[in-house]
A protein has these predicted regions:
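Surface-exposed, charged secondary-structure patches
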Residues: 76-112
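A short gly/proline-enriched turn/hairpin at secondary-structure junctions
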Residues: 55-66, 78-81
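Positively charged n-region of N-terminal signal peptides that target proteins for export
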Residues: 1-4
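Bacterial N-terminal signal peptides
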Residues: 7-16
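Hydrophobic pocket/interface hotspot
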Residues: 36, 47-48, 56, 71, ...
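A mature extracytoplasmic/lumenal domain signature
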Residues: 52, 62, 86, 91, ...
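Short beta-strand edge/turn micro-motifs at domain boundaries
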Residues: 119-144
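Short, low-complexity N-terminal intrinsically disordered segments enriched in polar/charged residues
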Residues: 15-54
Length: 144
């Protein structure tokens, strides 16, 4: 009886662990978010082009809203530039071919030679394309 109880306890523990593990789709989205973050930090324009959907709507915490072309142009020209940039406390929710991502945007932004600490919240919408690639279709930042 002790062995049966031990086996059942182990199975319950393991099944809880498996349920808590991220899915492969969540891992793909997390990787896409990381690639976007690194592309923004390092001004990797081809990577930004590859990750942003043509119909992207990119909202800033200031209320400014950009399309794909304007978002990438600001990174390319240095209007949006970063000394450091990372996403923290990320939560990914999947719904069919859409991923909703909430995270904390933590950066040392560069305004000319001035370093500006930036701590805002982000809400991103990613969509899985027919080719299996995840593209950013929407982003809204807000102050907390």
């Amino acid at each position: 009886m002790k062995k049966a109880t031990l086996v059942i306890s182990f199975l319950c523990l393991f099944s809880g662990y498996a349920a808590a593990a991220p899915t492969s789709a969540e891992q793909e989205v997390a990787q896409a978010v990381d690639h976007l973050t690194q592309a923004m930090l390092h001004k990797d324009i081809p990577q930004l082009q590859a990750l942003a959907a043509e119909n992207l709507t990119y909202g800033h915490s200031s209320g400014n809203i950009q399309d794909k072309k304007a978002f990438i142009a600001d990174i390319e020209t240095g209007k949006s530039a970063f000394k450091t940039l990372e996403m923290k406390n990320q939560k990914i929710t999947l719904s069919g071919d859409v991923a909703l991502v909430r995270n904390h945007f933590s950066a040392q932004a560069l305004k000319g030679t001035e370093v500006v600490p930036t701590e805002i919240e982000n809400f991103q919408i990613w969509q899985k394309q027919k080719d299996g690639k995840w593209l950013l279709i929407g982003r809204q930042a807000f102050r907390f």
